Amino acid sequence: MNQSTTTTTASPGRLAPEAFAERARSIEAEVGRVIVGQRDLVRQTLTGLLANSHVLLEGVPGLGKTMLVRTIADVIDCTFNRIQFTPDLMPADITGTNILIEEGGQRVFRFQPGPIFANLVLADEINRATPKTQSSLLEAMQEHQVTVARQRFPLDPPFFVLATQNPLEMEGTYPLPEAQLDRFLFKVMVPFP
């Protein structure tokens, strides 16, 4: 009686399923050392990242949403930028802008990248900014690029947006446009610990 053995191999640059699962458990455990008592929150957020998607975290201030995102960035060792959304934040504050510089005796415009140019971007309190500013994330989240002055600038992979928002009942918040909500794989409600 011959038994055939099936081995699972991964393509170059990819982990085998067993190794992937072990790596995911390791990341979850490491994040869990800092974010204590919020296992479901950690797991749901990491699920979004492992699915190569963006996640929206909703909860009142002080529940550790920002700490969670910073910890994930540290654990997975990626470039990280935080954007604090406020009513006076402008789209160029996120995407970047062309600045006029003197070079070789001439004035030229040079692109100055904004904080969206990172592997993991924390859009903190995203619903405190105006809809116009919120919409500056749309192209980046959907197409992994930014267009400024008719020039396209690709975002380095991997690219994830983890956004936090306060409940709409709180003063000074704006609802996220439907097009913005569609860019997130899911919204995680952050409970009290």
Give a label for each model feature.
Residues 49-87:
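Walker A/P-loop
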Residues 101-106, 129-133, 141-193:
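Canonical AAA+ ATPase core
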Residues 60, 94, 164:
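P-loop (Walker A) phosphate-binding loop of NTP-binding proteins
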Residues 17-63:
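Pre-Walker A (pre-P-loop) alpha-helix and adjacent loop at the N terminus of AAA/AAA+ ATPase modules
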Residues 44-47, 100-122:
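Conserved alpha-helical scaffold flanking the Walker A/P-loop in AAA+ ATPase domains
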Residues 59, 124-125, 136:
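Walker B catalytic acidic pair
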